[in-house]
Amino acid sequence: MNLIRAILLLIFLSTPLKANTIYNLIKIPNLEIYEINTKNKLRYFYAARPFQLGTQKNIVCSNPNKKDLELKYKIIHKNLNRYSYDYLKKINLKYIVMCENLSISELYTAGIPDNIMKTLILDIKFNEKYFERVIHHEVFHVMHLQHKNIFNEEEWAKFNNFEFKYAECSTCTKNISLEKYQETNGFFTEYSKSTASEDMAEVYSHMIFLEKKEINQIRKLDPILNNKISYIENKIKEIDNSFTY
């Protein structure tokens, strides 16, 4: 009986111990391990219960159901598996947190990058149509935060037509559509027109997500996007010369 009690006590204590260990790593409560044995050494966690973050507790996300988690993990893993361990290390990304209905100050968002904690929070209930591409959009934000000295927003803005101006912030504009333009004219999507950093992330995500043939065709037809793509290519080489897309 004493042995059985000891085993039951160990099982009872193991779950909060794991949660505490994860919290100490990335300062997000209520997480549990989903997968940690991956080729590129990314660690995947999920929200076992809803959590709130930030000094004002304005970052909120809920726990997903098992079926959604299984489905979306496969999609996330497939897309992030394109990145090598070395590349992820250079952009400072190690932990993926999966939850649903992610919001900041009641504004829903696809993801929240935190290069300091080496973490990317992803909303697995984000719009199905754009979900895969948006994963790479958020990866760029991690890289941008880690290498702000490399990605110069003023230099980037000069690629656009002289009369074009970005908004002050991504939530200060009605340019929110992620639908790819049929005629790009310097921008992949309406959301690209919000801020320089969002434009960079949209260019990067399309570079990764679209077929090479389609990217090459866009480059031939759109000189502004050709310059933007070349810029992203060259800056990534400064971070990891071995990376290909």
Regions found by a protein language model. Name each.
Residues N92-Y245:
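Active-site-flanking segments in enzyme catalytic domains
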Residues K27, T38, A48-P50, T55, ...:
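Generic alpha-helical secondary structure signal
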Residues N20-D68, E100, T171-Y181, S197-D199, ...:
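Non-catalytic architectural context of zinc metalloproteases
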Residues T15, K74, K78-N81, Y85, ...:
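Surface-exposed alpha-helical segments enriched in charged/polar residues
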Residues G54-I116:
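Auxiliary, metal-adjacent structural segments of Zn-dependent hydrolase domains
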Residues M1-T21:
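Classical Sec-dependent N-terminal signal peptides that target proteins to the secretory pathway
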